[in-house]
Amino acid sequence: MRLLAAIGVLAIIGVFGAALYFFGGFYSVAGTQEDPAIVHWALVQVRTASIVRHARDPQPADFDDPANVQKGAHEFDEHGCANCHGAPGGNWQKFSEGIHPDPPDLKDVVPERTPAQLFWVIKNGINMTGMPSFGPIGATDEDIWQIVAFLKKLPNVSEADYKAWTKPPAPPAPPAPPAAAPTPPPADAPATPPAQNQ
């Protein structure tokens, strides 16, 4: 009985101590500091479990068609994904070094995720990270599946292919100028005499 009472007292002290630590402002939320190992571990476990549970969207049958892969590279570039995650032949932008946790190198992450999980993350974002949700800002499901198709091929995409797929389209040719209207004769020019019958 005394043992149970002691355990109960210690549990209460632990709860109050944790509450004081977190709600008393002692836990630093600065992006320049790493989370304690136990906090980092807990966040990773919660994040992974949440993604696995919520990623239920069925992938389109032809989502990894080569044309979709190329369109996905264009969408990846247009939405600024390379700024934080890099791209074949491209570097991360300087500001991404200030994001915590660090944006992952997608070549390492993609093999660990199913297409449905990648789709869910891109569409919904991840709370308490720098990963935004692209669904609410105009990316359609088709756009996102194309990005997923590109990501699944990313480990084998060359710099030359990426540059070719993301190259801006050539501007359309300017319209041809309208044909010039015939110049009317001057007002004081003599009229052409009518032809006379012979």
What is the role of each PLM region?
Residues N68, G89, V121:
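Short glycine- and Lys/Arg-enriched binding-loop motifs that mark or flank ligand-binding interfaces
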Residues P88-N91, V110, G135, P193:
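Short, well-ordered turn and helix-capping elements at secondary-structure junctions
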Residues Q70-A82, E112-Q117, I126, G138-D141, ...:
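Sequence context surrounding c-type heme c attachment/ligation sites in exported
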Residues L43-V44, Q93-F95, F119:
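Short, flexible segments with low predicted structural confidence
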Residues R2-H74, G135-F150, K167-A189, P193:
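Periplasmic c-type cytochrome electron-transfer domains
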Residues A67, P103, A160-P168:
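Polar/charged alpha-helical tracts
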Residues H74-H100, N124-M128, P132-S133, P155-A160:
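Periplasmic/extracellular electron-transfer cofactor-ligation site
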Residues G98-L154, Q198:
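Extracytoplasmic electron-transfer domains, predominantly the class I c-type cytochrome c fold
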